[in-house]
Design a protein with these regions (language model features):
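A charged, well-structured terminal subsegment
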Residues: 132-155
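Rossmann-fold NAD(P) dinucleotide-binding segment
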Residues: 85-104
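Glycine-rich, highly charged phosphate/nucleotide-binding loops
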Residues: 1-4, 54-87
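NAD(P)-binding Rossmann-fold cofactor-contacting core
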Residues: 24-29, 35-56
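Conserved beta-strand elements of the Class I
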Residues: 18-19
Length: 155
């Protein structure tokens, strides 16, 4: 699979909800700015932050498992955590049934890639959702398929 432009396009065109692990309530941080920008362009965000509270107007879940227990299917999991934590997040994403894992710009993990790809997840690393959206001219979310996989993708 890998993080080719085709995979990036499949993710950006196939999902309209982003579960953001490491989402921040601080508008000065990329972990707030990027998902907030995606939200303004029509994507729904599900923040995951161990502090809970409200982030970008949405209730933050403390873990991916807590989000899943609250009825939030992970689908696309966007990661704003250090590279050293990415494999743990990948395992959690697989455990809750995610179908795509995106490691933001600066986050690289061969272990996370192996975990995700072995489980059949689409995988991207070291790229920014917002930058890629603009670069590829995709100003709207996917075709309203919610948190599920892209058309024709089983998982």
């Amino acid at each position: 699979m890998g993080d080719t432009d085709a995979v990036v396009e499949e993710i950006l065109a196939g999902y309209d909800t982003i579960t953001v692990v490491g989402a921040s309530a601080d508008p000065a941080k990329a972990a707030h700015r990027v998902p907030a920008l995606m939200q303004r362009h029509g994507w729904r965000t599900v923040p995951v932050n161990p502090r809970g509270g409200l982030i970008m107007g949405e209730p933050a879940h403390r873990t991916l498992a807590e989000a899943a227990a609250a009825g939030q299917r992970a689908g696309l999991v966007d990661v704003f955590r250090p590279s050293a934590r990415a494999a743990d997040v990948a395992r959690q994403a697989v455990a809750v049934g995610a179908t795509a894992l995106w490691l933001q710009l600066g986050i690289v993990s061969d272990d996370a890639r192996a975990i995700a790809e072995d489980a059949g997840l689409l995988f991207v690393q070291n790229r920014c959702l917002s930058i890629e959206r603009r670069r590829l001219g995709l100003d709207a979310p996917g075709p309203g398929i919610g948190q599920g996989p892209a058309e024709g993708r089983s998982r």
